[in-house]
């Protein structure tokens, strides 16, 4: 069955990766080496994911002990 309005990839990253680990957009942006504004636009569905950003997102984020503990 086809989805009529599939979610933006950034929304999926936000909901399935950042939120469950308690990682803020600011923390994730710093770990990825991008501005908070850039990452926020992607996660909120206002910007696409460039090939360079896809490579950055493919790398594991360095987590603090608090984040690893959940």
Curated annotation (Swiss-Prot):
Residues 13-68 form the HTH cro/C1-type domain. InterPro entries: Cro/C1-type_HTH (IPR001387), Lambda_DNA-bd_dom_sf (IPR010982), Toxin_antidote_HigA (IPR013430). GO terms for molecular function: DNA binding. Keywords: DNA-binding, Transcription, Transcription regulation. It holds the Pfam family HTH_3. The keyword Protein biosynthesis does not apply. It comes from the Bacteria. Belongs to the VapA/VapI family. PANTHER family: ANTITOXIN HIGA-1. This is Uncharacterized HTH-type transcriptional regulator Synpcc7942_2319.
């Amino acid at each position: 069955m086809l989805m009529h309005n599939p979610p933006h990839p950034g929304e999926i990253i936000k909901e399935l990766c950042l939120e469950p680990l308690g990682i803020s957009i600011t923390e994730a942006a710093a770990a990825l080496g991008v501005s908070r504004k850039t990452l926020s636009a992607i996660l909120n569905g206002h910007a696409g994911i460039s090939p360079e950003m896809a490579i950055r997102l493919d790398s594991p984020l360095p987590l603090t002990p608090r984040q690893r503990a959940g």
